[in-house]
């Protein structure tokens, strides 16, 4: 949520920034609503004071033996006016609230202009895509050759499309990736491992920005409890700070969390229907940071580097791109996507998004830190990134490390987790 003081002081400036990402703020309507809100707040307070004064007068008049019926009628009329004013004030406040929660974050000035992912800007590349002396197979074909290590038919029987069953060494490789990622981030990058629920309430999803706008992307449990399956560990981990005031000495907070993630992929009909690239259930190791406001841009670069380290240790070619305004997530001020090379597709595909949300999520969550200079609680800054998406990392390993006979070499970094297995 944006700072409402900034909105009221400079709605035109906010509108210009929002227009960069395709959001139109009707400044005249917003100003009129806000002015009406102030008028109604004054009016309700005046009516409340007047009714209180007249109510006291009834007792005094009664003690003097005067006729109190006219005063009672006046108090009743003031009560009706007060209720009407309160109702109108609530309606105006509700409309303003809907505007506030529906506004995306302001893009950082460095974010490139653009309408969609085709206009994202490449920042850097690492590694060289492998050259094969044979036609490279995709991960689906490789999974079939590896003793049915990836079984999409079984998953379709159990559940439906966009799921997978893993078996044997492929399943172990998947688990090894999770352990390797968590070990690296906790031992080398200073993150604390955290385990969280895989179901959250509406307040948590509102805090990180998934609700109310993106309800169609979520799985809601049809049960007595009003819970949702998490689309990412970002939701429960970031909400650890909701309604909290964190001491300055505790910052930065850095968490690494492995969870399954659940997404309906409502807007992805017909996209990536083959294999593991886009699934309803997938594993991810998420990195979350909560920092002082002045530290968040440096933290974004560091967090992105932490995610890149995993790919470098696995010797997987990748590139980093800055998302343009049209591809930027709702809550983000700036996002780097890390895209890994997939030989079968002959292209780079997203494996991590690393974002700085500034104080946008913190304002929605009332997540604050106590500024030692002022002694007052202020919104902190939140960041997160995938470190990494485990399924897509598995796909990248299968395709980049494949051999002509369909077997797959295990990357050196994962061999300590594979119990002596060096080839699948």
UniProtKB/Swiss-Prot annotation:
GO terms for cellular component: cytoplasm. Its EC number is 6.1.1.11. Pfam families: Seryl_tRNA_N, tRNA-synt_2b. The keyword Cytoplasm applies. One of its GO terms (molecular function) is ATP binding. It is found in: Cytoplasm. Keywords: Aminoacyl-tRNA synthetase, ATP-binding, Cytoplasm, Ligase, Nucleotide-binding, Protein biosynthesis. Coiled coil: none annotated. It catalyses: tRNA(Ser) + L-serine + ATP = L-seryl-tRNA(Ser) + AMP + diphosphate + H(+); tRNA(Sec) + L-serine + ATP = L-seryl-tRNA(Sec) + AMP + diphosphate + H(+). Pathway: Aminoacyl-tRNA biosynthesis; selenocysteinyl-tRNA(Sec) biosynthesis; L-seryl-tRNA(Sec) from L-serine and tRNA(Sec): step 1/1. One of its GO terms (biological process) is seryl-tRNA aminoacylation. ATP binds at residues 263-265, 350-353. It is an enzyme of class 6 (ligase). L-serine binds at residues 232-234, 286, 386. Consists of two distinct domains, a catalytic core and a N-terminal extension that is involved in tRNA binding. HAMAP family: Ser_tRNA_synth_type1. Catalyzes the attachment of serine to tRNA(Ser). Is also able to aminoacylate tRNA(Sec) with serine, to form the misacylated tRNA L-seryl-tRNA(Sec), which will be further converted into selenocysteinyl-tRNA(Sec). Homodimer. The tRNA molecule binds across the dimer. Belongs to the class-II aminoacyl-tRNA synthetase family. Type-1 seryl-tRNA synthetase subfamily. This is Serine--tRNA ligase.
């Amino acid at each position: 949520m944006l700072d409402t003081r900034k909105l009221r002081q400079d709605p035109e400036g906010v509108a210009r920034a929002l227009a960069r990402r395709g959001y139109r703020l009707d400044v005249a309507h917003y100003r009129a609503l806000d002015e009406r809100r102030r008028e109604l707040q004054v009016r309700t307070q005046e009516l409340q004071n007047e009714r209180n004064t007249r109510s006291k007068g009834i007792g005094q008049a009664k003690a003097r033996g005067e006729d109190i019926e006219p005063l009672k009628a006046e108090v009743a009329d003031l009560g009706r006016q007060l209720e009407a004013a309160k109702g109108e004030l609530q309606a105006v406040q509700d409309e303003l609230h809907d505007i506030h929660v529906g506004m995306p974050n302001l893009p950082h000035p460095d974010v490139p202009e653009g309408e969609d992912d085709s206009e994202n800007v490449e920042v850097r590349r690492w590694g060289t895509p492998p050259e094969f002396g044979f036609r490279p197979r995709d991960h689906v074909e490789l999974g079939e050759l590896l003793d049915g290590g990836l079984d999409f038919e079984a998953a379709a029987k159990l559940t439906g499309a966009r799921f997978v069953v893993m078996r044997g060494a492929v399943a172990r490789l998947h688990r090894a990736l999770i352990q390797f990622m968590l070990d690296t981030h906790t031992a080398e990058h200073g993150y604390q491992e955290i385990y969280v629920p895989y179901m959250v309430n509406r307040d948590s999803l509102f805090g990180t920005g998934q609700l109310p706008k993106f309800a169609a992307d979520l799985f809601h449990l049809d049960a007595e409890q009003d819970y949702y399956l998490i689309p990412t560990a970002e939701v429960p981990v970031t909400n650890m700070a909701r309604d909290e005031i964190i001491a300055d000495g505790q910052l930065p907070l850095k968490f690494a969390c492995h969870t399954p993630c659940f997404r309906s992929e409502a807007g992805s009909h017909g996209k990536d229907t083959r294999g593991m690239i886009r699934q309803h259930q997938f594993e991810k190791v998420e990195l979350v940071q909560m920092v002082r406001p002045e530290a968040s841009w440096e933290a974004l670069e560091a967090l992105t580097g932490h995610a890149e380290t995993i790919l470098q240790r696995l010797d997987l070619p990748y590139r980093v791109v800055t998302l343009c305004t049209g591809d930027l997530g709702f809550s983000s001020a700036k996002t780097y996507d890390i895209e890994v090379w997939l030989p079968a597709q002959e292209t780079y595909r997203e494996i991590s998004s690393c974002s700085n949300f500034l104080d946008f999520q913190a304002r929605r969550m009332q997540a604050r830190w106590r500024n030692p200079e002022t002694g007052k609680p202020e919104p902190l800054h939140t960041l997160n990134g995938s470190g990494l998406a485990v399924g897509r990392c598995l796909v990248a390993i299968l395709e980049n490390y494949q051999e002509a006979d369909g077997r797959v070499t295990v990357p050196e970094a994962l061999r300590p987790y594979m119990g002596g297995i060096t080839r699948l």
